[in-house]
């Protein structure tokens, strides 16, 4: 028998406490469940506390349920890479192509839904931090891993980066990267 449809407002009434920094996500449909056929569906709240750019080998589907968010992306096909901010407003959808470095910036009192396709066995995700010095923009640190539990692994990598100043220091220019944006540093669209 199939489960009932998930009612987002009711789910948020009883479960919003599960949306905790740094990622603020909760997997409502986990890839380990046979019913999901490997898909991951997350409810994600704001504000989040992360500056990483996630690189996923599959496309990611974003639906902004409440408020607006900013999806920071990097186009690596140009030299130097081009940074582009994509606002996703309430009620809007966005499909991010596979292997696109992206940093989802979520603001206070916002809620979105993110769906990821099943990864191929052994597929490697990455989390990358770029230098915040606009004249540099080099990769400060990157961690690659086989993603088996998005709900816990992303948080662990963010915390690993946050807790190690050497990892946060740009080898090219010496600027220390932040693990989360300061209040007001990124303007909500």
UniProtKB/Swiss-Prot annotation:
Report the InterPro entries cross-referenced here: 3hydroanth_dOase, RmlC-like_jellyroll, RmlC_Cupin_sf
Question: What does the sequence similarity comment in the record state about its family?
Answer: Belongs to the 3-HAO family.
Q: Which Gene3D superfamilies does the annotation name?
A: Jelly Rolls (2.60.120.10)
Q: Which residues are listed for a divalent metal cation binding in this entry?
A: 131, 136, 170, 173
- Name the positions where substrate binds: 60, 106, 116
Instruction: Give the record's pathway.
Output: Cofactor biosynthesis; NAD(+) biosynthesis; quinolinate from L-kynurenine: step 3/3
What does the record give as EC number? 1.13.11.6
- Which compartments does it reside in? Cytoplasm
* Pfam families (alphabetical): 3-HAO (PF06052)
> Which CDD domains does the UniProt record give?
cupin_HAO
Q: Which GO terms describe its cellular component?
A: cytoplasm
| A GO biological process held by the record | 'de novo' NAD biosynthetic process from L-tryptophan
Give a short account of what the protein does. Catalyzes the oxidative ring opening of 3-hydroxyanthranilate to 2-amino-3-carboxymuconate semialdehyde, which spontaneously cyclizes to quinolinate.
Q: What sort of enzyme, by top EC class, is this?
A: oxidoreductase
UniProt gene name? bna1
**Residue positions binding Fe cation:** 54, 60, 102
Q: Name one GO molecular function term.
A: ferrous iron binding
- Chain coiled-coil ranges: none
What cofactor does its activity depend on?
A: Fe(2+)
Keyword Metal-binding among UniProt keywords:
yes
Name the reaction it catalyses: 3-hydroxyanthranilate + O2 = (2Z,4Z)-2-amino-3-carboxymuconate 6-semialdehyde
**Origin superkingdom:** Eukaryota
**Binding positions for O2?**
50
| Name of the protein | 3-hydroxyanthranilate 3,4-dioxygenase
UniProtKB keywords: Cytoplasm, Dioxygenase, Iron, Metal-binding, Oxidoreductase, Pyridine nucleotide biosynthesis
